[in-house]
């Protein structure tokens, strides 16, 4: 109450920020007459002039007014569009490293040209991030006219681009691309072996379009580059057979949190079932040796209790296909991670595809936090302002609309059943169409879209346009024409995002569709005039009918997604309306107290087909949504804390890797590693201050033979009178260094330097891959520590640190052992295969297997399966001596 009074007296914080921008906007406007009088050549020449001012020590803020005035004039000349004052404000907010909330139709794409041009003058490159390839390509082609007029280069990253094309696009002043492509390029770059093969430059500034979709909705989506792991389909099938034997008391399911865990009784029961099936090693289910069995039992439970066929996934052509929860589309080629997809395949009795092992991964949260400067645009961000600030340090500023918004939002209508709800929606649509009012209906899935469309065809004779396109170009055309009088478009709520619905239709879309490719300039002009007149006529009809009417078929967990649907109408001061039709069967209503609401409706004597409509209902629903939003925020925040642990380790590994790639001579690093390994081996068998009779001389001799390939008289050394452990260390060091010096003399220093660098990078990659797998397994079971009154996050931090230290120790030993036991042949190196990437539940195709180190083979001795150092030279296509049944090049030959 007091907050509301204070806001009326002093204005909100947002109002104060907007007011503070007015002075700068006035200064830009004052420059307009000056730039208007310039010739095209003189206007373009302002770019080198502004760059020279930066070179002389001025800051971006010093040249901002001149830069914004220049872009505005260039847009007028190339696009025929002049930035409004509110668009200048949006540009200022973006340049300030904040999120600009701008309503649909306010021209966010044009707004971005202002800060993009200004920041591109530094020469460090600006990334403009969109949600799909179509929008990246469209925006790049559209806005490139402005940038190129002013002498800047523009690139676009799309899926089909090869490394050469990507490198060229990233080298441009302005680069458009999707969040997935940019993230995968970062991961792939950190798997390359030569600096010149990397495609990205150091990060400088990114503007994220639809920032809420990318940084909130997809925040938990890790980008993963994977390789194929061992086939464990038989284990998934065996565990799946146990699931029907569980009873509801064996697990606790939280529908709100979409999670399921075994109860104490359930843990005992599944342990007993696994032991009966011969799937459990000795000890209990939660011991380290049984981590694989626990993993499969957990994923099997999730598959059977949390995931419903035709809701979360569908079965098609002997495959389990994910259904996108935001768009309702089938997501071909994507797979749930952590073995969940295999558990679903076992449940449905389809072919089980091999699991993929993570080679590299990063979440969008951590990827975008690497940019020194970050900003974003969207029509809906204020409801998540706290999360943007807490996670990314981004303030949200609501930009005023250019014209007052006159859309009428009606109160929700709540029906008892979904059948009554859909009948009421069909009736409302028929009424709108009768008066020529265009209607957009938002649903949560393709199935619901098709159900409503069929209902309308059979009961009202209305033939709606159902939007379930798999191609963004087609989707964009349908959504762009949804403002034609009498049009009825049914779409999943997120479909077509990024494309405006203009009353009367979209001129550019119609020109692209109706103008022949070989049209002459005269034919083009005539067609444009004809279409423009037709669109204006239809716009007048749509306006007279009340503008676009938006209908929501149910509330989402997030108010933001509801607001996105509403925001489709009422653009640029146009009239419009919106209403939501709900039923007690809807997910949100069912999860949050529909029983209480049902009994209340019965007491009110609500007849079939009648709805309850009251502002109180809206408020109650908003409170429920706020609870879900807060819970989801806490989940994302908690996951980020865990991911930050891995992120710190990832940064260390990637920085070390880059340092190795920059350095041509890593002999000093290798020598340091070798010395540490020697000291570790000696100290392990000859502890400090131990008496000679306590020394494990035989063990030391065996380890020296294993690691360095040297048969030294260590037992004799240890029996000498007065020998000290330091002397043993000195003798061992001397003999090892002599062996390595002889190897260098035999092959030459240049060859050894190349081999050292190649081996070090490759072994580091292999061990990082193994470490990621260990971290995944640790993460899956860590929440159970809470039962022992221990904090899972602290446990994860300490254990993952120990695992990281172990990885580094193992790395030193493996590099040292490989270099000490290799013999070289001078074959040309084969090109490494390209890894493939995917997002989150996305594990499309197997990726890389590691690729052997060029020209390296162990010395030939008698082969023992468990001792690779005894295998000698193994042909790449020969079966691996370890007994795996795989070819050597796909097994130990892939690891160096």
Curated annotation (Swiss-Prot):
EC number(s) reported in the record: 7.4.2.8
Needed co-factor(s): Zn(2+)
UniProt keyword Electron transport present: no
GO BP, sorted A to Z: intracellular protein transmembrane transport; protein import; protein targeting; protein transport by the Sec complex
Entry GO CC: cell envelope Sec protein transport complex; cytosol; plasma membrane
PANTHER family per UniProt: CHLOROPLAST PROTEIN-TRANSPORTING ATPASE (PTHR30612:SF0), SECA INNER MEMBRANE COMPONENT OF SEC PROTEIN SECRETION SYSTEM (PTHR30612)
Record's protein name: Protein translocase subunit SecA
The organism of origin for this protein: Rhodospirillum rubrum (strain ATCC 11170 / ATH 1.1.1 / DSM 467 / LMG 4362 / NCIMB 8255 / S1)
